[in-house]
Regions:
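Hydrophobic anchor at the beta1->P-loop junction of P-loop NTPases
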Residues: 40
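Conserved substrate/cofactor phosphate-moiety recognition/catalytic segment
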Residues: 49-103, 143
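ATP-binding Walker
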Residues: 46
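Glycine-rich phosphate-binding loop used to anchor ATP phosphates in small-molecule kinases
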Residues: 83-130
Length: 217
Protein backbone atom coordinates (compact mmCIF):
# COMPACT_ATOMS: atom_id res chain seq x y z
CA UNK A 1 0.00 0.00 0.00
CA UNK A 2 1.25 3.45 -0.90
CA UNK A 3 1.87 6.08 1.76
CA UNK A 4 -0.67 8.30 0.00
CA UNK A 5 -3.36 5.77 0.81
CA UNK A 6 -2.89 6.01 4.57
CA UNK A 7 -5.39 8.83 4.95
CA UNK A 8 -8.22 6.51 3.91
CA UNK A 9 -7.58 3.97 6.66
CA UNK A 10 -9.42 4.08 10.03
CA UNK A 11 -7.22 5.28 12.87
CA UNK A 12 -7.66 2.08 14.87
CA UNK A 13 -5.71 0.18 12.18
CA UNK A 14 -2.69 2.49 12.14
CA UNK A 15 0.40 1.90 14.23
CA UNK A 16 3.68 3.79 13.99
CA UNK A 17 7.01 2.28 15.00
CA UNK A 18 9.72 4.82 15.75
CA UNK A 19 13.38 4.43 16.68
CA UNK A 20 14.92 7.65 17.92
CA UNK A 21 13.62 10.59 15.85
CA UNK A 22 13.17 8.74 12.56
CA UNK A 23 10.15 6.74 11.53
CA UNK A 24 11.39 3.52 9.96
CA UNK A 25 8.23 1.51 9.45
CA UNK A 26 4.48 1.45 9.47
CA UNK A 27 2.78 -1.71 10.65
CA UNK A 28 -0.88 -2.49 10.10
CA UNK A 29 -2.19 -3.87 13.35
CA UNK A 30 -5.90 -4.73 13.53
CA UNK A 31 -7.09 -3.46 16.91
CA UNK A 32 -10.30 -5.12 18.04
CA UNK A 33 -12.50 -2.70 19.92
CA UNK A 34 -14.00 -3.91 23.23
CA UNK A 35 -17.41 -5.52 22.76
CA UNK A 36 -19.96 -4.12 25.22
CA UNK A 37 -23.39 -5.20 26.42
CA UNK A 38 -24.64 -2.10 28.23
CA UNK A 39 -27.97 -2.23 30.07
CA UNK A 40 -29.57 1.07 31.10
CA UNK A 41 -31.76 1.18 34.18
CA UNK A 42 -33.62 4.10 35.70
CA UNK A 43 -36.90 5.78 36.51
CA UNK A 44 -39.07 7.30 33.78
CA UNK A 45 -37.59 10.64 32.62
CA UNK A 46 -34.17 9.83 34.08
CA UNK A 47 -32.53 10.22 30.65
CA UNK A 48 -32.09 6.63 29.48
CA UNK A 49 -33.11 7.19 25.87
CA UNK A 50 -31.08 10.39 25.68
CA UNK A 51 -28.00 8.48 26.85
CA UNK A 52 -28.61 5.52 24.54
CA UNK A 53 -28.99 7.73 21.49
CA UNK A 54 -25.90 9.72 22.41
CA UNK A 55 -23.83 6.55 22.70
CA UNK A 56 -24.98 5.35 19.28
CA UNK A 57 -24.40 8.77 17.74
CA UNK A 58 -20.86 9.02 19.09
CA UNK A 59 -19.85 5.37 18.58
CA UNK A 60 -20.36 3.81 15.16
CA UNK A 61 -19.90 0.33 16.62
CA UNK A 62 -22.90 0.66 18.98
CA UNK A 63 -26.50 -0.40 18.31
CA UNK A 64 -29.45 0.76 20.44
CA UNK A 65 -32.23 -1.68 21.31
CA UNK A 66 -35.31 -0.32 23.07
CA UNK A 67 -37.85 -2.38 25.00
CA UNK A 68 -40.54 0.23 24.36
CA UNK A 69 -39.79 0.38 20.63
CA UNK A 70 -39.86 -3.40 20.31
CA UNK A 71 -43.10 -3.64 22.27
CA UNK A 72 -44.66 -0.97 20.10
CA UNK A 73 -43.56 -2.79 16.94
CA UNK A 74 -45.29 -5.98 18.06
CA UNK A 75 -48.39 -4.56 19.74
CA UNK A 76 -48.76 -0.91 18.75
CA UNK A 77 -49.88 1.48 21.49
CA UNK A 78 -51.32 -1.39 23.56
CA UNK A 79 -48.95 -2.78 26.17
CA UNK A 80 -50.17 -6.26 27.21
CA UNK A 81 -48.36 -7.16 30.45
CA UNK A 82 -48.89 -10.87 29.84
CA UNK A 83 -46.69 -10.67 26.74
CA UNK A 84 -43.69 -9.03 28.41
CA UNK A 85 -41.76 -12.30 28.50
CA UNK A 86 -42.10 -12.62 24.72
CA UNK A 87 -40.87 -9.05 24.19
CA UNK A 88 -37.80 -9.58 26.37
CA UNK A 89 -37.03 -12.93 24.73
CA UNK A 90 -37.01 -11.24 21.32
CA UNK A 91 -34.88 -8.42 22.70
CA UNK A 92 -32.30 -10.90 24.01
CA UNK A 93 -32.25 -12.74 20.68
CA UNK A 94 -31.64 -9.49 18.79
CA UNK A 95 -28.94 -8.48 21.28
CA UNK A 96 -27.02 -11.73 20.82
CA UNK A 97 -27.35 -11.54 17.03
CA UNK A 98 -25.82 -8.06 17.06
CA UNK A 99 -23.06 -9.04 19.50
CA UNK A 100 -22.11 -11.99 17.28
CA UNK A 101 -21.67 -9.53 14.43
CA UNK A 102 -18.99 -7.85 16.62
CA UNK A 103 -21.02 -4.74 17.38
CA UNK A 104 -21.71 -3.45 20.89
CA UNK A 105 -25.25 -3.08 22.24
CA UNK A 106 -26.91 -0.55 24.52
CA UNK A 107 -30.26 -1.75 25.89
CA UNK A 108 -32.69 1.11 26.55
CA UNK A 109 -34.93 -0.23 29.32
CA UNK A 110 -36.22 0.82 32.73
CA UNK A 111 -35.22 -2.59 34.19
CA UNK A 112 -36.37 -1.78 37.76
CA UNK A 113 -35.84 -5.31 39.11
CA UNK A 114 -32.63 -7.28 39.52
CA UNK A 115 -34.11 -10.32 37.79
CA UNK A 116 -34.66 -8.23 34.64
CA UNK A 117 -31.18 -6.73 34.89
CA UNK A 118 -29.55 -10.16 35.18
CA UNK A 119 -31.52 -11.41 32.17
CA UNK A 120 -30.45 -8.46 30.04
CA UNK A 121 -26.82 -8.55 31.19
CA UNK A 122 -26.28 -12.27 30.62
CA UNK A 123 -25.36 -13.42 27.13
CA UNK A 124 -23.87 -16.59 25.69
CA UNK A 125 -21.72 -14.59 23.30
CA UNK A 126 -18.08 -14.83 24.36
CA UNK A 127 -15.75 -11.91 24.89
CA UNK A 128 -18.46 -9.43 25.87
CA UNK A 129 -17.95 -6.85 28.64
CA UNK A 130 -21.17 -6.36 30.62
CA UNK A 131 -22.14 -3.11 32.31
CA UNK A 132 -25.30 -1.93 34.06
CA UNK A 133 -25.63 1.87 33.92
CA UNK A 134 -28.04 3.19 36.56
CA UNK A 135 -29.28 6.72 35.91
CA UNK A 136 -29.71 8.70 39.12
CA UNK A 137 -31.89 11.80 39.40
CA UNK A 138 -33.14 13.55 42.53
CA UNK A 139 -36.81 12.98 43.29
CA UNK A 140 -37.85 16.63 42.85
CA UNK A 141 -36.22 16.78 39.42
CA UNK A 142 -37.80 13.49 38.38
CA UNK A 143 -41.25 14.63 39.44
CA UNK A 144 -40.88 17.86 37.48
CA UNK A 145 -39.84 16.04 34.31
CA UNK A 146 -42.69 13.54 34.59
CA UNK A 147 -45.23 16.29 35.20
CA UNK A 148 -44.13 17.88 31.94
CA UNK A 149 -44.93 14.56 30.26
CA UNK A 150 -48.31 14.33 31.97
CA UNK A 151 -47.18 11.39 34.11
CA UNK A 152 -48.28 12.50 37.56
CA UNK A 153 -47.44 9.93 40.25
CA UNK A 154 -44.93 8.05 38.09
CA UNK A 155 -42.18 8.28 40.69
CA UNK A 156 -44.35 6.81 43.46
CA UNK A 157 -45.48 4.03 41.13
CA UNK A 158 -41.90 3.08 40.30
CA UNK A 159 -40.84 3.27 43.93
CA UNK A 160 -43.03 0.23 44.54
CA UNK A 161 -41.13 -1.89 42.02
CA UNK A 162 -37.62 -0.42 42.06
CA UNK A 163 -34.77 -2.48 43.51
CA UNK A 164 -31.25 -1.22 44.06
CA UNK A 165 -28.73 -3.24 42.02
CA UNK A 166 -27.08 -6.18 43.71
CA UNK A 167 -23.49 -5.64 44.76
CA UNK A 168 -22.21 -8.43 42.49
CA UNK A 169 -23.43 -6.65 39.35
CA UNK A 170 -21.02 -4.59 37.22
CA UNK A 171 -22.64 -1.20 37.80
CA UNK A 172 -21.85 2.41 37.00
CA UNK A 173 -23.75 5.34 38.49
CA UNK A 174 -24.78 7.95 35.93
CA UNK A 175 -26.01 11.15 37.57
CA UNK A 176 -28.31 13.30 35.47
CA UNK A 177 -29.87 16.15 37.46
CA UNK A 178 -28.85 18.71 34.83
CA UNK A 179 -27.31 18.92 31.38
CA UNK A 180 -23.94 19.79 32.91
CA UNK A 181 -24.11 16.75 35.19
CA UNK A 182 -25.11 14.57 32.23
CA UNK A 183 -22.02 15.70 30.32
CA UNK A 184 -19.76 14.98 33.29
CA UNK A 185 -21.19 11.49 33.74
CA UNK A 186 -21.02 10.88 30.00
CA UNK A 187 -17.34 11.82 29.96
CA UNK A 188 -16.62 9.26 32.69
CA UNK A 189 -18.65 6.59 30.88
CA UNK A 190 -16.93 7.11 27.53
CA UNK A 191 -13.54 7.07 29.25
CA UNK A 192 -14.54 3.74 30.77
CA UNK A 193 -15.68 2.32 27.43
CA UNK A 194 -12.36 3.23 25.80
CA UNK A 195 -10.26 1.83 28.62
CA UNK A 196 -7.87 -0.90 27.53
CA UNK A 197 -7.32 -2.22 31.03
CA UNK A 198 -9.61 -3.39 33.82
CA UNK A 199 -12.39 -0.75 33.84
CA UNK A 200 -12.87 -1.01 37.59
CA UNK A 201 -9.61 0.68 38.43
CA UNK A 202 -9.29 3.27 41.16
CA UNK A 203 -10.20 6.30 39.05
CA UNK A 204 -13.70 4.91 38.46
CA UNK A 205 -14.45 3.65 41.97
CA UNK A 206 -16.38 6.79 42.98
CA UNK A 207 -18.85 6.16 40.15
CA UNK A 208 -19.56 2.52 40.94
CA UNK A 209 -22.15 0.73 43.08
CA UNK A 210 -22.93 0.11 45.98
CA UNK A 211 -23.41 3.71 47.21
CA UNK A 212 -26.46 4.55 45.12
CA UNK A 213 -29.20 6.90 46.28
CA UNK A 214 -32.44 6.33 44.45
CA UNK A 215 -35.52 8.51 44.06
CA UNK A 216 -36.96 7.24 47.35
CA UNK A 217 -34.51 9.41 49.30
Amino acid sequence: MRAADLGNVPLQFKAKVRIGESEIARRWVPVRLPLWNIVLSGYPASGKTMLARRLVSDNANFVRLSVDDLRGMFYGPVQPPKEEEFVYDQLAALRDLILRSRRSVVLDSTAPRNSTRRFLLNTRVEGVVRLLVVLLVERSELEGRNQERGLVGAVDAWNRTWENPQTNMPVMKFRNNSLAEFETSYYVLTDLLRSKINPYRRRFIAHLFPKIRDAKS
